């Protein structure tokens, strides 16, 4: 079964505050032609994002909108399970999804989510929830969507936004738990491999220089003899 195409869910903060869903026919169809929880979840997200837009910076709103939108699209179109029924295992599945999303959910640039046309706003066909960044000036390599992999920092930012979303819903008594907070502790993408870190040490030449200086200081002032003793002890 082919992966459903993703459609944008939320316009800019200014447009979202007083949104008229009739002006977004594709979005309206998605919410009306599916189970009733689609609409309620979208309204939860809208309420949360308006709260973020009112109290945080424009950058924070844009980042949270991206993450909440991805999560809701996965909930709607992939998992097909209400947010208040999701468990830790579901969230870990979402992490796997974000690690390797469907190719049709990946684009190469940042596009406007909605475009005006015929008196309404239509979802931009070039837009996708995930973006594969291409190095500037790299025109020799053909972009390969299958190589998309988010950094650990990107996944951490995603989890942070969704944790905040669930926390808001709990405070508003829409949800009773925060499965994302629990899942993050067991997410394999956040478990760091045990690595032997290079210990920074002075080279032999550097040590010799320090020792020579200490000797000179001790020769000129007996008060520095203790320093010479300590440095010599560290060296040996």
Question: What do these predicted ranges mean?
Answer:
Residues 1-76, 82, 93-96, 100:
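Basic/aromatic DNA-contact patch characteristic of tyrosine site-specific recombinases
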Residues 152, 209-236:
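Basic, Lys/Arg- and aromatic-enriched nucleic-acid-binding interface segment
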Residues 45-59, 69-197, 216-219:
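N-terminal core-binding DNA-recognition domain of tyrosine recombinases/integrases
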Residues 12, 19, 133-135, 214:
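Low-complexity, intrinsically disordered/propeptide-like segments
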Residues 190-212:
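DNA breakage-rejoining catalytic core of tyrosine-based enzymes
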């Amino acid at each position: 079964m082919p992966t459903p195409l993703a459609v944008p869910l939320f316009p800019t903060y200014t447009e979202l505050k007083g949104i008229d869903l009739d002006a977004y026919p594709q979005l309206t169809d998605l919410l009306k032609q599916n189970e009733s929880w689609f609409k309620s979840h979208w309204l939860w997200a809208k309420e949360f994002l308006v709260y973020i837009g009112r109290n945080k910076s424009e950058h924070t709103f844009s980042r949270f909108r991206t993450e909440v939108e991805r999560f809701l699209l996965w909930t709607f179109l992939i998992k097909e399970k209400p947010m208040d029924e999701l468990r830790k295992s579901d969230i870990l599945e979402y992490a796997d999804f974000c690690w390797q999303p469907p190719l049709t959910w990946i684009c190469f640039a940042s596009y406007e989510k909605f475009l005006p046309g015929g008196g309404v706003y239509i979802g931009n066909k070039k837009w996708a929830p995930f973006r594969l960044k291409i190095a500037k000036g790299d025109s020799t390599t053909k972009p390969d969507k299958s190589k998309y992999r988010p950094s650990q920092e990107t996944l951490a930012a995603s989890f942070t936004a969704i944790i905040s979303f669930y926390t808001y819903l709990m405070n508003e008594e829409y949800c009773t738990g925060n499965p994302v907070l629990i899942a993050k502790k067991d997410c394999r993408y956040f478990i760091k491999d045990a690595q032997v870190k290079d210990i920074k040490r002075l080279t032999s030449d550097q040590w010799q220089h320090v020792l020579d200086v200490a000797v000179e200081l001790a020769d000129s002032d007996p008060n520095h003899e203790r320093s010479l003793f300590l440095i010599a002890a560290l060296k040996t």
